[in-house]
Amino acid sequence: AMQLIEKNLGKFPVKAVIISHSHVDHFGGIAGVMAKEDKADETLSIEDQLASGKIPVITPVGFTEHSVKENVYAGKGMGRRSNYQYGILLPPGVTGKLAQGIGMGQSTGTVSFMTPSYEITQSGEKLTIDGVELEFQLTPGTEAPAEMNTWLPQYKALWMAENCTGTLHNLYTLRGAEVRDGAAWASYITEAISLYGKDAEVTFQSHNWPHWGNNVVNDYMVNTAAVYKYINDQTLTY
């Protein structure tokens, strides 16, 4: 990913790493972006971390706990089931690859991990990093136990983490990750619409394509929330 950016956009220093949630495909590549010795001192305030020349690692509260629960305590079993769920070990070829709905394949590279130097602990918290304004919305218990959306007001852009992906995502995943709460998931998407829907001109997420235009963004988010709420409500009804 870094090579792709540098090839097409040029080389830029990494000022911070923001990890949206506690799933390995969203934090496991961090060693490709920064070295451990470059991580900012977590005993410093976030302002001092940013001024130190080191790289803050910013996550939602609970990130470390849930990353360890899923990938260490349950890691072996989940890893084996993932091989079946995603077809990771199938050789590429006309009869040998499995698409995943939110992507054409899964990385088979080395997994890395770093603890955060700073945790977002409440919705509405704002940071400015290298001139870019950021506002965070915590969404615990949605697609991941620890997750957050991020609003970039200068760009009218809403990063929906993995809470909206252009598909019906898993409420229960075959690899054995924690079951997701459809009602909470829908509620936090609805909250995002209430907070940012009036101004958002683009929404993007950690899988699949962006959605452009205010009406498109709002329809996309409303429809995604409705899917999870409907499944939750119909399950309780019947």
Positions of PLM-derived features:
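Metallo-beta-lactamase
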Residues: A1, A51-S52, I58, G62-T237
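Active-site metal-binding motif and surrounding structural segment of the metallo-beta-lactamase
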Residues: M2-P56
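A generic secondary-structure signal for well-formed alpha-helical elements
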Residues: I5, L9, E37-L44, T59, ...
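Catalytic metal-binding/acid-base residues of hydrolase active sites
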Residues: H23-D25, F63, C164, W209
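Short acidic, glycine/serine/threonine-rich loops at helix termini
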Residues: G28-G32, S67-Y73, G79, H169-Y172, ...
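Acidic, His- and aromatic-enriched active-site or binding-groove loops in soluble protein domains
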Residues: A40-E65, N149, V227-T235
